[in-house]
A protein has these predicted regions:
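Amphipathic, low-proline, heptad-repeat alpha-helices and/or compositionally biased low-complexity charged/polar-rich
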Residues: 1-7
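Active-site metal-binding core of divalent-cation-utilizing nuclease and nuclease-like domains
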Residues: 8-37
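Short, solvent-exposed coil/turn elements at secondary-structure transition points
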Residues: 18-19, 49, 85, 107
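Alpha-helix boundary/capping detector
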Residues: 23, 30, 70, 84, ...
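Conserved catalytic cores of phosphodiester-cleaving nucleases, focusing on short active-site segments
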Residues: 28-54, 58-63, 79
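Alpha-helix termination/capping residues and helix-transition junctions
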Residues: 38, 73-74
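Short, charged, amphipathic alpha-helix that recurs within catalytic cores of restriction-modification
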Residues: 54-72, 78-85, 89
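Domain-level recognition of nuclease-like catalytic cores that cleave nucleotide substrates
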Residues: 77-122
Length: 122
């Protein structure tokens, strides 16, 4: 959570969020957001080994987010994949899709994005 608060100005970090609405459910590994001037929300998906369906899963969560959390409709929404191990081609695919990549090593969370990275706001 330190990297989320220091890098993105996040005020609230909530792990393991589960929500049900109209017979549907959504599970988030981490929901982080700020209501202050940054006014953004970040969904963090944690994977030990990134596979192609992991990228698709996060994109689906990002697309459904506002249906389940209308109270955050005014926020810019970003995705972060936090992984222990990711093949370079999948890492590049996620970055090209505008998803932040973070590495997990010894329980440390570190952003791994190139200087020219352009995140996508959903």
């Amino acid at each position: 959570s330190k990297i989320l608060t220091e890098t993105f100005g996040i005020e609230v970090v909530t792990p393991r969020v589960k929500v049900r609405k109209a017979g549907r459910s959504l599970e988030l590994d981490v929901l982080a957001y700020a209501n202050s001037e940054c006014n953004a929300a970040y969904i963090v998906e944690i994977k030990s080994h990134l596979r192609p369906d992991g990228i698709e899963q996060l994109q689906n969560i990002l697309e459904q987010f506002r249906t389940f959390f209308p109270e955050h409709a005014d926020k810019a929404l970003y995705g972060i994949l936090a992984v222990v191990d990711a093949p370079e081609d999948l890492r590049q695919e996620a970055l090209s899709a505008g998803i932040f990549m973070a590495g997990i090593n010894d329980e440390q969370f570190k952003l791994e994005v190139p200087k020219n990275f352009q995140p996508k706001a959903w």
